[in-house]
């Protein structure tokens, strides 16, 4: 139900029975004019007045909504004092106004009401209008909801259209010029001039502008726009002048011209919005800068807080002393006061005590350089540094490069880097969205907006925030009453290396061949930490070529380096035995009073340990694996054989087969890997340059060796001057695994067959090249004597290659026979 149809608002006759107001039904019928025709007619001695300010115009904004009864009463003319009938009665009493109101048609949407009246005919309507206006001016009627605007009244000159459609008033009126005779062509209507329109419409209020239709416009009927200074004035003009017939005397032509009025919603000029839309090259970078500034102001302190909490482990429950006490007490009850298996590492740490003390000494010095701990995978680098050298240092940040480097795509890489340092919140997914926005904006404006950020930029943000957090942590140990309290922050940090946090970067250069931007940025960041004395930086790496990458960040520094090797046989045996005894060493003695024996004392098969360790080697992870298998009840020999078989299977999968599954990232061929396996099965080490002379390594041999070293099939030992000199198995257990693989006749025949086939292709290519050159020389006229030497050289080379081909084919026949007969 619309507001205008809500009879309870306007059932004014119920408020005062004596008033000549229509009943509710009569009122409802008048909303669309008499007999719902949309018009009001006035007969002889009748007229129509339009009163404004009867209802609040703003009520139009909630048209069509159900209105509460209290609002009906508040805006009721009887409550607000704007009842037109009451106004007329007072004017009659005080000014002898000679009219009688007969019907009232309220126009809630327009805030006014039509009043139909009768008079005796002796007084013209212009005098009636003048008298009523003087009364309203001398005794203004101001409703409570508009105390600054008084009620006004005008005689309706036209034939008002009282439609009940949802059309809202506006300060602009569209005046259409329609011919005065029905059925006449619209072109017969007269276009009134601005002066004429001003004369007709200025009495209803101040006009801001009159806009005439463009002369070349073909829109019919012709029209003009009237812009009033307020909506109220436009409402008054529209209701009083709609349907007015401009006579010939007034300039309306012979047949006259009707004025048809309607509200026109004027499009307001939005200069600021238009300027913003029309200048994207200026606005978009400004918006990007504002967003970046807001993010920096809001999120940077939060991120710094979380990074500090990650380093100091403030929010980690497991580091709380009470939690540790409860956990330790509960563990003792559950495990029965058994020793921790980590105690078995004591033998290792005793052997590497010098390395531990060396790292601790370096951390007390001011030298602004890196500390590098290099060793093969599984040699215990992280345990040595984090669990031993930094055992008493609570301010340490451990960053594992492996998940960062193995992440696929920019967003996962950024998320992994942020998680490593506790940087949050991180909106890595926003980079994809901002990238699309940036691309769209670049297509529209021709320039980048700066919304999107590269992976390099976002990594720099993470490292810079971490730098801020590390510096704040280091300076938290500074006190105002210190003797050197007058020093600047940078000078104080340089003078107190013992107060600097320690950053441990683990798995540095892991899979560095897949892209080095992460490692380059990390090395640059680590260089800033050390040169500004904010933190000590320790790199843990398997790569022997680490200096090439780190020298870019610190080109003028000598690195402090510790190289970890495999354990000696004595230390390895002690480690395994200690690991076996760890669980039962604290058990109570037998009740019969006999001496308690440890597993290492009553197990007779431990005599095999010496020979087993010789086969297994001293790699820490392999020794721990051996100890766990022996603890489950396996004999040392069986355990070692299982480990060797497992390593052999691993070698086949990682280095020989499965090249298709590796996505083409391998830079060595299976033949090159097998050649090294076969040679190292016979010898514990190979001479580097001698290996490069092998025919299978003639093309890209050095690159293949470096990649196989990165993949940890082999290890390349350099001499004192840094030149590669020796090739050894990547792990000690690989030597035994190589032997195991070389003893497999079918596998050996299959891979040797591939090598010989490859070598045969190489020699056949050499023969083709020699034959082509000999054919070219044979076409020379009068064979020059100078070509004789070249011909002899080519013939000798061709003959040597032919001998090799025949040899290879003979060997291939034997290999085919083995593959056909063996299972």
Swiss-Prot record:
Gene giving rise to this polypeptide = YME2
Q: Name one Pfam family in it.
A: RNA12
Q: What is its main location?
A: mitochondrion
Task: Quote the function comment for this protein.
Answer: Plays a role in maintaining the mitochondrial genome and in controlling the mtDNA escape. Involved in the regulation of mtDNA nucleotide structure and number. May have a dispensable role in early maturation of pre-rRNA.
Residues on the membrane's Mitochondrial intermembrane side span 303-823
- What family is it from? Belongs to the YME2 family.
Q: Tell me which Gene Ontology terms the entry assigns under biological process.
A: mitochondrial genome maintenance; mRNA processing
- Full protein name: Mitochondrial escape protein 2
GO molecular-function terms, A-Z: RNA binding
Keyword set, alphabetical order: Membrane, Mitochondrion, Mitochondrion inner membrane, mRNA processing, RNA-binding, Transit peptide, Transmembrane, Transmembrane helix
List membrane-spanning regions. 282-302
Membrane topology of this protein:
Single-pass membrane protein
Origin superkingdom: Eukaryota
Name the InterPro entries for this protein. Mt_escape_2_C, Nucleotide-bd_a/b_plait_sf, RBD_domain_sf, RRM_dom, Yme2_C, Yme2_RRM
Question: What does the UniProt entry say about where the protein is found?
Answer: Mitochondrion inner membrane
């Amino acid at each position: 139900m619309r507001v205008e149809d809500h009879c309870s608002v306007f059932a004014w006759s119920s408020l005062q029975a004596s008033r000549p107001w229509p009943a509710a039904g009569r009122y409802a019928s008048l909303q669309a004019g008499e007999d719902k025709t949309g018009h009001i007619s006035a007969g002889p001695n009748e007229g129509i007045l339009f009163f404004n300010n009867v209802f609040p115009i703003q009520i139009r904004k909630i048209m069509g909504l159900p209105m509460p009864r209290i609002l009906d009463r508040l805006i009721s003319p009887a409550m607000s004092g704007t009842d037109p009938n009451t106004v007329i009665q007072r004017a009659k009493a005080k000014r002898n106004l000679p009219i009688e109101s007969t019907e009232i048609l309220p126009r809630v949407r327009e805030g006014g009401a039509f009043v139909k009246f009768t008079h005796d005919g002796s007084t013209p309507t212009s005098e009636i209008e003048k008298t009523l206006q003087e009364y309203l001016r001398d005794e203004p009627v101001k409703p409570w909801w508009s105390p600054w605007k008084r009620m006004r009244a005008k005689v309706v000159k036209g034939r008002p259209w009282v439609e009940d459609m949802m059309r809202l008033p506006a300060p602009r009126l569209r005046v259409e010029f329609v011919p005065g005779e029905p059925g006449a062509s619209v072109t017969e209507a007269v276009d009134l001039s601005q002066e004429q329109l001003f004369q007709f419409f200025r009495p209803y209020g101040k006009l801001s502008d009159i806009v005439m239709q463009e002369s070349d416009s073909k829109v019919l009927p012709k029209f003009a726009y009237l812009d009033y200074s307020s909506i109220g004035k436009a409402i008054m003009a529209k209701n009083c002048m709609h349907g007015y017939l401009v006579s010939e005397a007034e300039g309306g032509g012979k047949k006259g011209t009707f004025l048809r009025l309607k509200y026109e919603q004027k499009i307001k000029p939005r200069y600021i919005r238009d300027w913003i839309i029309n200048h994207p090259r200026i606005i978009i970078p400004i918006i990007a800068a504002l967003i970046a500034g807001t993010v920096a102001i809001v999120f940077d302190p939060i991120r710094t807080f979380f990074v500090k909490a990650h380093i100091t482990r403030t929010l980690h429950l497991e580091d709380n002393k009470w939690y540790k006490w409860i956990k330790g007490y509960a563990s003792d009850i559950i495990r029965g006061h058994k020793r921790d298996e980590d105690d078995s590492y004591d033998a290792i740490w005793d052997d590497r005590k010098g390395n531990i003390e060396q790292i601790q000494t370096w951390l007390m010095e001011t030298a602004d350089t890196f500390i590098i701990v290099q060793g093969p995978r599984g040699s215990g680098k992280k345990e040595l540094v984090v669990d031993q050298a930094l055992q008493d240092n609570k301010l340490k940040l451990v960053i594992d490069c492996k998940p960062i480097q193995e992440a696929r795509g920019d967003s996962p890489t950024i998320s992994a880097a942020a998680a490593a340092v506790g940087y949050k919140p991180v909106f890595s997914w926003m980079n994809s969205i901002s990238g699309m926005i940036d691309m769209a904006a670049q297509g529209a404006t021709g320039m980048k907006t700066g919304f999107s950020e590269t992976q390099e930029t976002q990594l720099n943000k993470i490292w810079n925030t971490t730098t801020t957090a590390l510096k704040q942590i280091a300076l938290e140990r500074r006190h105002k009453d210190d003797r050197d309290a007058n020093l600047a922050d940078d000078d104080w940090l340089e003078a107190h290396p013992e107060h600097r946090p320690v950053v441990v970067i683990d798995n540095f250069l892991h899979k560095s061949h897949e892209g080095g931007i992460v490692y380059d940025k990390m090395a640059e960041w680590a260089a800033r930490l050390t040169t500004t004395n904010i933190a000590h930086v320790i790199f843990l790496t398997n790569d022997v070529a680490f200096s090439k990458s780190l020298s870019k960040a610190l080109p003028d520094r000598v690195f402090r380096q510790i190289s970890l090797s495999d354990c000696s046989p004595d230390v390895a045996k002690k480690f395994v035995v200690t690991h076996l005894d760890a669980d039962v060493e604290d058990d109570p003695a037998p009740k019969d009073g006999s001496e308690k024996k440890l597993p290492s004392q009553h197990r007779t098969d431990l005599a095999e340990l010496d020979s087993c360790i010789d086969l297994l080697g001293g790699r820490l992870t392999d020794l721990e694996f051996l100890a766990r298998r022996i603890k489950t009840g396996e004999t040392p020999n069986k355990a070692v054989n299982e480990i060797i078989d497992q390593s052999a299977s691993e070698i086949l999968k990682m280095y020989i087969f499965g090249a298709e599954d590796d996505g083409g990232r391998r830079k060595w061929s299976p033949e090159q890997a097998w050649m090294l396996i076969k040679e190292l099965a016979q010898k514990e080490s190979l001479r580097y340059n001698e290996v490069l002379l092998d025919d299978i390594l003639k093309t890209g041999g050095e690159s293949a060796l470096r990649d196989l070293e990165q993949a940890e099939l082999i290890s390349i030992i350099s001499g004192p001057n840094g030149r590669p000199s020796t090739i050894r198995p990547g792990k000690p257990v690989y030597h035994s695994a190589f032997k195991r693989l070389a003893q497999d006749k079918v596998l050996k025949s299959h891979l040797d067959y591939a090598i010989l086939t490859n070598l045969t292709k190489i020699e056949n290519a050499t023969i083709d090249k020699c034959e082509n050159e000999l054919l070219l020389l044979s076409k020379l006229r009068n064979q020059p004597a100078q070509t004789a030497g070249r011909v002899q050289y080519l013939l000798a080379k061709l003959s040597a290659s032919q001998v090799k081909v025949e040899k290879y084919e003979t060997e291939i026949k034997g290999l085919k026979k083995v593959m056909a007969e063996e299972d």
